[in-house]
């Protein structure tokens, strides 16, 4: 962040806590208002940051060649996330099998590339 600012770049923060160090140092950005964090690895803050980045990406895309319809389609799909999570929790399926495989493991390697890389990092942090 410092390096970008030293070179004249703008830094925008996506933060949960008003007045946090990142919020103060950036001076501009978005507050996601996820509520108090119970742990450093806060799932709700991570999820809300991903949602904010999705909206930000759509907004940037609209300034280029991203159609309004495509943006609306992505938002419509994203609005289904709570329903999809509820469906999963009601019937976890093959994830239960994966849990059985790793529940007694001494170590687990999380892999992800592209858009899945931060999710893999978050999973590793939480396990």
Per-range role (PLM):
Residues 1-12, 21-25, 32, 63:
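Secondary-structure transition/capping motifs at alpha-helix termini
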Residues 15:
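H-loop (His-switch) motif in ABC-type P-loop NTPases
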């Amino acid at each position: 962040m410092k390096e970008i600012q030293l070179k004249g770049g703008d830094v925008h923060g996506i933060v949960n806590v008003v007045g946090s160090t990142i919020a103060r140092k950036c001076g501009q950005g978005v507050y996601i208002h996820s509520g108090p964090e119970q742990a450093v690895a806060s799932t709700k803050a991570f999820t809300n940051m991903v949602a904010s980045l999705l909206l930000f990406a759509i907004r940037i895309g609209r300034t280029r060649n991203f159609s309004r319809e495509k943006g609306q389609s992505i938002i419509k799909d994203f609005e289904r996330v709570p329903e999809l999570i509820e469906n999963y929790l009601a019937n976890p399926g093959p994830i239960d099998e994966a849990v059985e495989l790793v529940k007694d493991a001494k170590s687990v390697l999380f892999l992800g590339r592209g858009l899945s890389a931060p999710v893999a990092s978050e999973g590793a942090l939480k396990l």
